[in-house]
Each structure stands twice: as structure tokens, then as C-alpha cells.
């Protein structure tokens, strides 16, 4: 699996973030570093298709994000920690929606990840009743379960307790995952993971 970005341009109002930006990544974990406002989260959203660049192209292997937007997005998952804007759904319904979208998801694996993050008792609660930390754990459980080629995680350790941080590091560092999945993450601290590279913004 290869992520390739060519000639990417993006700016907010009159503040340019990316000019002719290029990047090529393969399997393994890449750490995006940079000061606040450098564009780390924006780059993850651009790669994940949550926002569109003003110019440039992004590929996953031979799938181009604008030519095949749905196919592209079903090969990646963006874990940003944002609260889902679906107040009428339960936690279980939010999870079921993702399982139905991402073909090949193993429900038993998802349940195991939910158990590891102590989320099984919350399944029938409205998703709006989760704390910010629980929302993050729900997204991370999905991130660790979905059979995607590209995993994008914004500040994965923010809001997590010590046990959850240790578990997440263990799961992200598993050799089978590192061999098959391109993982791009931001972190304001050294992530203490087996990195294949660092990108300074």
C-alpha cells in the first residue's frame, strides 16, 4: 500500500499552509510533527477526504481521491476525536453504521477492542452521553478494527488514561499491522512507537 501526494495546495483565507506539497508513504507509522497552526490536523483531513485541497492530487495505490472518492474513503479511516453529530443514535448504532460501510469488518474484533477500552457497558446509551475520552476510545476501537489500508489518527493519546495509552501503543505496534497498514498520526509528544519516518511541517 502506498500513499502519494503531489503538488498539494491549501490555505485558510490568506494564510497558506501547503504549497506544492509532496509526500510518499508506505506501510508503518509516520509521525507528523509541527508547531500549533502548522497544518498537522488539516493535512490529516486533506488526506482523509474530509476537506478538499485547492490543487493537487492524492492517491492510495491507484485510487485517486477525486476520481474515486467513495472507494478512496472506504480504504481509509480518520480518527480525529471529534464528537459525532448524530445525537439520535446509540453507541451501538454508530458502530453498526461503520461496520456496514466498511466491508470485511470483523464484529468480534470490534467487540474485543470495545472491551479493551471498557466501552461495552455504553453500547445502548445515546452517543451524546459519552465523555470526550469515551468518544475518543470509541473512535480508536473502530480504528483498530476496520480493515483499512490507511489509518489517520490526530493526537491519539490525548484524553486517554494510562492503561488505554499502553494498550493503544501495543496494538499500533503489532508487526502484522505495521506490515499491512499505513498509519499517519500527529502527536505533540514523542509517540513512543516504532516509526518508519517523521514528517516535519
Would you name each region that the model predicts?
Residues 56-72:
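Conserved ABC transporter NBD signature motif
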Residues 140:
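Hydrophobic anchor residue at the start of the ABC signature
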Residues 1-22, 26:
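A short, flexible loop at the N-terminus of ABC-type nucleotide-binding domains that lies
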Residues 36, 154, 161:
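ABC-family nucleotide-binding domains
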Residues 82, 87-103:
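Q-loop/switch helix immediately C-terminal to the Walker
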Residues 107-122:
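Conserved ABC ATPase "signature" region
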Residues 48:
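Helix-to-loop junction immediately C-terminal to a conserved catalytic motif
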Amino acid at each position: 500500500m502506498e500513499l502519494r501526494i503531489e503538488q498539494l495546495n491549501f490555505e485558510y483565507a490568506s494564510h497558506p499552509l501547503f504549497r506544492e506539497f509532496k509526500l510518499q508513504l508506505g506501510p508503518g507509522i509516520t509521525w507528523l510533527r509541527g508547531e500549533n497552526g502548522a497544518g498537522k490536523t488539516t493535512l490529516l483531513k486533506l488526506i482523509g477526504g474530509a476537506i478538499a485541497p485547492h490543487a493537487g492530487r492524492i492517491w492510495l495505490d491507484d485510487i485517486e481521491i477525486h476520481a474515486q472518492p467513495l472507494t478512496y474513503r472506504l480504504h481509509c479511516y480518520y480518527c480525529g476525536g471529534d464528537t459525532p453529530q448524530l445525537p439520535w443514535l446509540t453507541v451501538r448504532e454508530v458502530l453498526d453504521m461503520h461496520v456496514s460501510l466498511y466491508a470485511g469488518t470483523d464484529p468480534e474484533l470490534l467487540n474485543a477492542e470495545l472491551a479493551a477500552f471498557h466501552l461495552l457497558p455504553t453500547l445502548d446509551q445515546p452517543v451524546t452521553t459519552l465523555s470526550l475520552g469515551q468518544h475518543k476510545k470509541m473512535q480508536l476501537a473502530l480504528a483498530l478494527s476496520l480493515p483499512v489500508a490507511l489509518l489517520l489518527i490526530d493526537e491519539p493519546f490525548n484524553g486517554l488514561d494510562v492503561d488505554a495509552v499502553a494498550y493503544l501503543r501495543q496494538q499500533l505496534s503489532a508487526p502484522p499491522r505495521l506490515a499491512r497498514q499505513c498509519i499517519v498520526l500527529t502527536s505533540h509528544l514523542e509517540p513512543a512507537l516504532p516509526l518508519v519516518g517523521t514528517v516535519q511541517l
